[in-house]
């Protein structure tokens, strides 16, 4: 189940008031990118793509939800509202490699929460919506869409590293969606390839 677009936008605005920060504009950028990409892919609903992109980091509405905790908090918050399709993406968006050890940042939750996340990831098959939001997370800055290299450098600067296997997986996602669209990702999202990275 999903909120509608207006509900999702309202929920993000309210969450931004609770815990202001650049995370909310990052979510808006990811949502806009997801909608544009979905419009160019058969079998993907642009409205759903926008909504799940908009709320993928909603766990950051809780002030302490800065590292791994934002994943679990987002999942639990969306499940409380009955938005299981959003909750799923809250859980999967940081795991291009499907294990919690691949997380870039601190595992700042109790063991039972990290075990819940591990079990969740072990028992699902990532679908194209999961993959789409992983891709959009890797090209979205608060100021707007950027090259993947620029966004991954941003993460690396903030967290100290970005593992090569995750970096490679991000580029595989880019290639996967470019093949589905039959177009350059950067053309679709409006990033000028001349100015890359």
Please place each PLM-identified region on the residue numbering.
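Charged phosphate-binding loop/patch that engages nucleotide di/tri-phosphates or the phosphate backbone
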Residues: 161-197
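Acidic-glycine-rich active-site phosphate/pyrophosphate-binding loop
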Residues: 1-8, 48
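Conserved alpha-helix/loop element of class I SAM-dependent methyltransferases that forms part
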Residues: 33
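Generic N-terminal amphipathic, Lys/Arg-enriched alpha-helix
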Residues: 5-20
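Divalent metal-dependent catalytic cores for phosphoryl transfer on phosphate-bearing substrates
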Residues: 13-16, 40-155
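A short, charge-rich alpha-helical start-of-domain segment used by transcription regulators
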Residues: 22-24
